[in-house]
């Protein structure tokens, strides 16, 4: 596992080699995943009792889930805004910003929100070209309609590079603007929202639809919430985007020979194990984005240093988990971010953190020939996660 880390794998299309300097096709390898080949490793003793670990996971999820007040406030604001926009679609009157549809996306739609971050995402698809003036006009129209309905409620509206957001005292709804796909070819960078922003909003709709159809199993949602928390508390996991965490959670629970969901404690451990085995390293088959064409592997949005950092952080946490340190990893015993970089002891067992295996090569001087020895993200593929970073 560690032996392959940091080696150049020959770029996107393989490395130069062989007679005539042709290209070897890039063949990704499959990292070791115990749960895909469990039959090959029959148990010689009973499985350990993990009741306390399972209970700790459920308790942590309970602590992370939005409380009833947060849920009520975000539901109320989303419903009001949704209704106002629906009315503008059905009966725009003299309002010139024509709307195709509005869709709920992100963690609110997926049911993976966390407490303390009461933010929901809506995508509004315009029929017209998305000018900055149109976005501001729509934001003002929506907030004015809301104030007319309930003058006592204090609301603020702010425009931003992705659209606008409307906030009450205890909830925020981000409205992400995009346009119908044929309009993407007519954009003027001087007048309209950035095409990357528009494409990201369309991708968020695809992600929400895929999640609803494939990942609505409750164990998947709980695991994703726990992974989001892990990402926040361990800097080594920061490069993992919300969309990568969604796919990783679904993979860990559902991708096994029986096609039956694994138990939460098994799936949580499996996440760390497959990350430690190099699921998101260069040359790995990784996880293919189900919402993009061309077998796009989601981990290629990360730099090589980030891919390595995710791997060595997971390796350290797997060792701590195997020696009973789950409460520390789950954040139930104070700050644990130091565990990924400092030596720790668990029941007399010393765990030494894994070190990075990839060193970024020095900058090449002008005129030097570029070596094709790194695997780069495919050109033209944008980061597939536009949802609120949580």
From Swiss-Prot:
One of its GO terms (cellular component) is ribonucleoprotein complex. Signal peptide: none annotated. Pfam families: DZF_C, DZF_N. SMART domains: DZF. It is found in: Nucleus, Nucleolus; Cytoplasm; Nucleus. Residues 368-390 have a biased composition (Acidic residues). This is Interleukin enhancer-binding factor 2. It comes from Mus musculus (Mouse).
């Amino acid at each position: 596992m560690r032996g392959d880390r940091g080696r150049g794998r020959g770029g996107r299309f393989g490395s130069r080699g062989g007679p005539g300097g042709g290209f070897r096709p890039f063949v990704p390898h499959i990292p070791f995943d115990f749960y895909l080949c469990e039959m090959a490793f029959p148990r010689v003793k009973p499985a350990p009792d993990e009741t306390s670990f399972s209970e700790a996971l459920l308790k942590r999820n309970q602590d992370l889930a939005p409380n009833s007040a947060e849920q009520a406030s975000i539901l109320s604001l989303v419903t009001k805004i949704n209704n106002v926009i629906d009315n503008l679609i059905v009966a725009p009157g003299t309002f010139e910003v024509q709307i195709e549809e509005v869709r709920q996306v992100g963690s609110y739609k997926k049911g993976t929100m966390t407490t303390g971050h009461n933010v929901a995402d809506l995508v509004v698809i315009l029929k017209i070209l998305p000018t900055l003036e149109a976005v501001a006009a729509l934001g003002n129209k929506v907030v004015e309609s809301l104030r007319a309905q309930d003058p006592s409620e204090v609301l603020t509206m702010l425009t931003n590079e992705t659209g606008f957001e409307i906030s009450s005292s205890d909830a925020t709804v981000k409205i992400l603007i995009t346009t119908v796909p044929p309009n993407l070819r007519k954009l003027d960078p001087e007048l309209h929202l950035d095409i990357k922003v528009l494409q990201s909003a369309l991708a968020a709709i695809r992600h929400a639809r895929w999640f609803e159809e494939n990942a609505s199993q409750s164990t998947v949602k709980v695991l994703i919430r726990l992974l989001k928390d892990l990402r926040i508390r361990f800097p080594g996991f920061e490069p993992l985007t919300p969309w990568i965490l969604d796919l990783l959670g679904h993979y860990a629970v559902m991708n096994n020979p029986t096609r039956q969901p694994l138990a939460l404690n098994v799936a949580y451990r499996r996440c760390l194990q497959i990350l430690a085995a190099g699921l998101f390293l260069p040359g790995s088959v990784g996880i293919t984005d189900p919402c993009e064409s061309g077998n796009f592997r989601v981990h290629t949005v990360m730099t090589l240093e980030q891919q390595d950092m995710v791997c060595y952080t997971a390796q350290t946490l797997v060792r701590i988990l195997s020696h009973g340190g789950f409460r520390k990893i789950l954040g139930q015993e104070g700050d644990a971010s130091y565990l990924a970089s400092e030596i720790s002891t668990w029941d007399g067992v010393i765990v030494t953190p894994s070190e990075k295996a990839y060193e970024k090569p020095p900058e090449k001087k002008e005129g030097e020939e570029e070596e094709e020895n790194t695997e780069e993200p495919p050109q033209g593929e944008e980061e597939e996660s536009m949802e609120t970073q949580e």
